Amino acid sequence: VNPADHQPAPGHEIARLLDDVDAYAARLGTSRARLLDVGLISHATGIEPERVRGLLAGEPPEEEPREKNARELFRKALFKERLRFLQRTRLKETFAGREPYGLREISRATGISAQHVSNLLNGERGANHDHAARLEVFFRVPEGFCSRTEGAALIAYLRRMVNEDLPKLATRAVLQELGARSVALRSTADGAQIDTLRDLLPALDELVKVIQGKQSGGAQEGGRERP
C-alpha cells in the first residue's frame, strides 16, 4: 500500500487550512484577506500572484503526473519556472538599483557552469539534487523551493501560518488585552512553545472574560447612588 494514497488531496488540505485561517481571523476581528497577503505568499512559495489568488479561491492545485515520462517533463518545467521566478524576484543591490544576477555570477557562486544554468533556466535540462540545493542556497530560499508542486508549496506556507504565526498573533492580542504592554514570542526548534501557546489560548480567553466581567461589575457598583 502506498502511504501517499492515504494522504488528503492537496485541494482538501488547502481548504482545511484555510478554515483554520478563517477561525483565527474571526478571533482577531479581521478577515482572511487581511491575513493572507498574496504578494508575500507568492514571494515565499514561487507561485505567481494570479495563481495564488486562484488557489485561495478554491481552484484545484496542479498535481504531478503518475506516468514516468510525463512526471519527468513536469518536474523539469516546474524547476524552470521556480528558477526563473527566483532570478526575477531575488535581486542584487547595485549603484544603479536592484538588478537580477547574471549567469556568470550564479555560476561562480554555485560551481555550476554558466551554460548549465542557462539550460536550467530555459528548461533544456533537469536539475539533480546537488545542483538544486546549490541554487536554493544561492538565492537564500528553503530546500525544496524549486521542486515543490504549487499545492505542496501553498500547504507548507499555510501550515506555518496556522501552526506558528497565527497562534503567536492571537496570543499576543489576548495578552495585550490583559494589559501586557510588551509581548515577545519566539519559536523554538522543536515547536514546543507554539504547542503551548495553542493550548493556552482557550484559558486566556476565559481569563479575559472573567476580568472583563469583574470590570463591568465594578463599574456598575460605582455608578449606583448611595442611600
Residue spans for each PLM region:
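Interfacial/linker helices and their anchor residues that mediate assembly or domain coupling
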Residues: 154-227
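Short coil turns linking two alpha-helices in DNA-binding domains
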Residues: 48, 102, 113-116, 128, ...
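Short C-terminal boundary/hinge segments that cap the last helix of small helical domains
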Residues: 49-55, 140-157
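A short, Lys/Arg-rich alpha-helix, primarily the initiator
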Residues: 1-34, 39, 50-103
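Alpha-helical residues within the helix-turn-helix
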Residues: 43, 108, 137
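Residues within the helices of the helix-turn-helix
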Residues: 39, 103-108, 115, 133
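Short, basic-rich loop-to-helix N-cap that marks the start of a DNA-contacting helix
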Residues: 31-40, 100, 124-137
